[in-house]
């Protein structure tokens, strides 16, 4: 087991997610790694991962997409989140530092804090698959955030040198900034290792692109429930918390576009066992080396699906090579010549980076649904819920955040439910069956008076809510 020293040279300095110092390019590319090289062998990061003993300090809700914010605002968001948890958690290293009052723009971006596991010693394992947070004593996982669910990472800022912060989505906290407190000097190693994992995962994607590039891998293994509860920009619903005993899927949310010819008639689906997910009760303090062996690994990705979705970082030099090899000649990127530093961790979706046109079936599906009275087109969650009055009322709407995704909204026992209808393979399905189309799914359940089973509860389709003409 290698020690986590940075070698004889200067440690990589990381400021606000931008790997700083002369060792890094200012072009936002991971191609030119530090002159001393990465801290760890690639096969270790691509395999079991690199583990660090740190303290989990909690998380702060992030109410806006990090991609909608400029780089400086993102950095301010993570700094403010660190300050908030330091003030709230006893014994935090940064608790005694005075901070300026939260500015009005930041107060509209940051929401509530979740300090459920604050101060807990954990083993952070960084790999190309995920950031895995496991209780250091009882070895239970408190969070497992897949790389494709992480939109920003920051560490090593002079004012918060002991902290690493990253923004990720999961079903429990929705989008939140998670804070890790590191032993002295370790934060820079942690953020560098995260950078190495992003680099390697993107290279895996370039070597093994899918036959049809669609943003469909927000989950590493399909367990039949990881995609069927909708998550949108609004943070007011945490569906997996609504059902006692329901185990949330691994971190990340499905973001899928339809694929031509993917749908099939009703067939039984293959399910995988659910894995420990975003929050579990855990234990007490433990001490040890900075690097420990990982006790529990996340399930490996499905074969042929080694790719990012949202967010993916743009490795400019590799993309240029890929375009040249493919005969493409996209327009030059203005940041390649250093005109503006690129945020290394908040990454554009791969389909944008590789300039892939949208999947053709999305349009035909939309056209087909226009003939259904219960289809309301693009509608927000709040607007859809306002149309439901009686138990059994339902409608179908197009997701406002994911093109090509359709959401079934219904009222059951006085509670609105929102179910995604398109799985990560582009198939219209429920947990138990596949369908030729959304219309087929609706008519099947209505005509046979069958409820849709999701997250341990039932949704009955009784009264379609017609759209207003």
UniProtKB/Swiss-Prot annotation:
UniProt xrefs under CDD domains: PTB_Shc (cd01209), SH2_SHC (cd09925)
GO CC, any one term: focal adhesion
Subcellular location, record wording: Cytoplasm; Cell junction, Focal adhesion
Signal peptide per UniProt: none
Domain SH2 as annotated: residue spans: 374-465
Modified residues (N6-acetyllysine): 44
PTM annotation (Phosphoserine): residues: 29, 339
GO MF term list: ephrin receptor binding; epidermal growth factor binding; epidermal growth factor receptor binding; insulin receptor binding; insulin-like growth factor receptor binding; neurotrophin TRKA receptor binding; phosphoprotein binding; phosphotyrosine residue binding
Keywords: Acetylation, Angiogenesis, Cell junction, Cytoplasm, Growth regulation, Phosphoprotein, SH2 domain
Domain of life: Eukaryota
Domain PID residues, every copy: 46-229
KW Iron-sulfur (keyword) present: no
Subunit and interaction comment: Interacts with CPNE3; this interaction may mediate the binding of CPNE3 with ERBB2. Interacts with the NPXY motif of tyrosine-phosphorylated IGF1R and INSR in vitro via the PID domain. Once activated, binds to GRB2. Interacts with tyrosine-phosphorylated CD3T and DDR2. Interacts with the N-terminal region of APS. Interacts with phosphorylated LRP1 and IRS4. Interacts with INPP5D/SHIP1 and INPPL1/SHIP2. Interacts with ALK, GAB2, GRB7 and KIT. Interacts with PTPN6/SHP (tyrosine phosphorylated). Identified in a complex containing FGFR4, NCAM1, CDH2, PLCG1, FRS2A, SRC, SHC1, GAP43 and CTTN.
Function of the molecule: Signaling adapter that couples activated growth factor receptors to signaling pathways. Participates in a signaling cascade initiated by activated KIT and KITLG/SCF. Participates in signaling downstream of the angiopoietin receptor TEK/TIE2, and plays a role in the regulation of endothelial cell migration and sprouting angiogenesis.
PANTHER family reported in the protein's UniProt record: SHC TRANSFORMING PROTEIN, SHC-TRANSFORMING PROTEIN 1
Protein name listed in UniProt: SHC-transforming protein 1
Organism annotation: Rattus norvegicus
Phylogenetic lineage: Eukaryota, Metazoa, Chordata, Craniata, Vertebrata
Gene that this polypeptide is encoded by: Shc1
């Amino acid at each position: 087991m290698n020690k986590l020293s940075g070698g004889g040279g200067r440690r990589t300095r990381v400021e606000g997610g931008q790997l700083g110092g002369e060792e890094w390019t200012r072009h936002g590319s991971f191609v030119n790694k530090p002159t001393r090289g990465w801290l760890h062998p690639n096969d270790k990061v691509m395999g079991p991962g690199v583990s660090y003993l740190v303290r989990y300090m909690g998380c702060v809700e992030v109410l806006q997409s990090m991609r909608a914010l400029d780089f400086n605002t993102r950095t301010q968001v993570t700094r403010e989140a660190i300050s908030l948890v330091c003030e709230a958690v006893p014994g935090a290293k940064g608790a005694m530092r005075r901070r300026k009052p939260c500015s009005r723009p930041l107060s509209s971006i940051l929401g509530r804090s979740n300090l459920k596991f604050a101060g807990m010693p954990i083993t952070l394992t960084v790999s190309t698959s995920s950031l895995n947070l496991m209780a250091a004593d009882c070895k239970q996982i408190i969070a497992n955030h897949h790389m494709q669910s992480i939109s920003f990472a920051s560490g090593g800022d002079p004012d918060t040198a002991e902290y690493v912060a990253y923004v990720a989505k999961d079903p429990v906290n929705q989008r939140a900034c998670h804070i890790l407190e590191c032993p002295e000097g370790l934060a820079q190693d942690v953020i560098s290792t995260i950078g190495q994992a992003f680099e390697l995962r993107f290279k895996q994607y370039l070597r093994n692109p899918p036959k049809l590039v669609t943003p469909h891998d927000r989950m590493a293994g399909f367990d039949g429930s990881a995609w069927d509860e909708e998550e949108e920009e609004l943070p007011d619903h945490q569906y997996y918390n609504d059902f006692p005993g329901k185990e949330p899927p691994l971190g990340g949310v499905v973001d899928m576009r339809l694929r031509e010819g993917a749908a099939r008639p009703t067939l039984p689906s293959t399910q995988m066992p659910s894995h420990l997910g975003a929050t579990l009760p855990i234990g007490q303090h433990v001490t040890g080396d900075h690097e420990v062996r990982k006790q529990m690994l996340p399930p490996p990705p499905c074969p042929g699906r080694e790719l990012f979705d949202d967010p993916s970082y743009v490795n400019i030099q590799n993309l240029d090579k890929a375009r040249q090899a493919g005969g493409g000649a996209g327009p030059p990127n203005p940041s390649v010549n250093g005109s503006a530093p690129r945020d290394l961790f908040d990454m554009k979706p791969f389909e944008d980076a590789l300039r892939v046109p949208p999947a053709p079936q999305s349009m035909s599906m939309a056209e087909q649904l226009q003939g259904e009275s219960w289809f309301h087109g693009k509608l927000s969650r709040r607007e859809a819920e306002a149309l439901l009055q009686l138990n059994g009322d339902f409608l179908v709407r197009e997701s406002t955040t994911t093109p090509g995704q359709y959401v079934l909204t219904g009222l059951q026992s006085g509670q609105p439910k929102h179910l995604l209808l398109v799985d990560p393979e582009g198939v219209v399905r429920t947990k138990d069956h596949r369908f030729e189309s959304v219309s087929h799914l609706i008519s099947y359940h209505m005509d046979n008076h069958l409820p849709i089973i999701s997250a341990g509860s039932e949704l009955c389709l009784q009264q379609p809510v017609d759209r207003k003409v």
